[in-house]
Amino acid sequence: MDNTIIITEEATIDNYVSEYDIAVCGYGGAGGSAAIEAANNNSQVILFERASDGGGSTALSSCEMYLGGSGGTSLQNACGFEDSSENMIAYIEASLEGKGDQKKIKLYCENAASHFEWVKSLGVNYKESAHLGRIVVPESNESLLFTGNERVSPFSECAKPIPRGHVPSHEGDFGGKIFFDALKKAISKTKNISVSFDSRVLGLVVDQQNVIVGVSFKKDNIVQHVKVKKGVILTAGGFVMNEEMINKYLSFQTSFGAPYGNAWDKGDGIQIGLAMNANVINMDEAFFGVYFYPPESLTYGIFVNSDGNRFVNEDSYGARIDTIALNKKIKKFIWLFKMRTLSHQFILINFRFWLLQKPSRSSKLRQDLKRVRYHQQ
C-alpha cells in the first residue's frame, strides 16, 4: 500500500473543493476531541478519517485514562484519594527517565482533572469505586485502578502511590468503545464539524513562504484539496502497522512479539510532520507487555534470565518487565512461582506461556531449571 506523503505548492492547485478554519487528520479519540474543542471555539472544522468509520485505536482500547493532579479528580476524591499535580509530575518524570518534555508534563498534570470532567460531560459513566488489586483491566465495574508502577520501587520513593487509571464503568474490556460512542454522539450534535470518511490525507498544501494553507487528500480515488485558514491538527495514530517504519525505527525489537492495534496505524501523521521538517523524538520507543497477572498472587514468583539471575522486581507493571528485558538484551527468561491454588505450573520462556501438566517429564525444562539460582522471597 502506497504511503507516500506529498507537499503541494498552492500555485499548482487549480481549485479547492472547500474551505475551513481547521483540518483534523485522524478520527480517533484525540482527533474527535480536538474537533469538538475547535468547533466550540468558533472554528469551522473538517475531520478526515482514512477508514470507513471513526474510532481508530481508541475504540479498540480499554480506555484507561491516566488522570489526576490538582487535588485529584472527582473520581479519586470520591474514592478517598487526594492527588497533587506535583506528585503526579514527579511520578511521570521518574517513569520517563528524562525522556519527557517537562513543559508538556506540567501542562498535562495541571489540567488532567479538568480533562476528566470534560470526558464525563460527554456522557461517559464512571462508578465511584476503586479496584486496588493488581490487575490489567477490571473484571468488574469499578472505575479507578492502578495502571502503572506507582507502588513499585524506585517509583514509590519518588512519589506517593496514587491510583490514576480511570476506566468507564462496565464489566469486560471494551471501555474504548464506550468512550468513543459518547464522543461520536457529541460530534454529531456539534455544529461546525464536517466529517469525511474513506479519505486518506496525502499531505499538506503550502504557499510561497512555506506556510501551511491546505490539505491534500484522496477520496473516491480522486485527489482533492481543502483550504485551511488557521491550521492543521495531526491525530493519525502510531506506525505499528507500517512495516517499513518498524524496520527503520524498531528493527532491534521486531523479533519480540507481533504488531497489535488498528489496521490503519500507518504513521501517516508522523510522515506528514517529517515531510514538513518537523522534529520527532523517541521513535525507537514501543509498548511491549508481559502480563502474567491477575491473579495478584503470581507477583510472588521470580523472573530469572538464562543465567539464573533475577533481573527485575516482579511487582512491576507488565510493560516495564518486558522493556527491562529488551534493554538488557535478555532474549529468554523464566518465570517461577509456587501457587497452591493452581494444579499446574506456568513457565514463561521466550516470551511465551507454556502450560505443563508434569514439568519433570520435559527434558528441555529440566535443562533450563538446572541453570536457575533459586532466590528466596
Task: Tell where the protein language model's regions lie, with residue ranges.
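Glycine-rich FAD pyrophosphate-binding loop
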Residues: 40-61
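Extreme N-terminal leader/targeting segments of oxidoreductases
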Residues: 1-22, 40-42
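Conserved redox-cofactor binding core of oxidoreductases
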Residues: 107-223, 243-244, 293
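Glycine-rich active-site loop/strand segments that organize a redox cofactor
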Residues: 66-108
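Glycine-rich loop(s) and the adjacent beta-strand/alpha-helix scaffold that form part
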Residues: 174, 220-222, 227-291
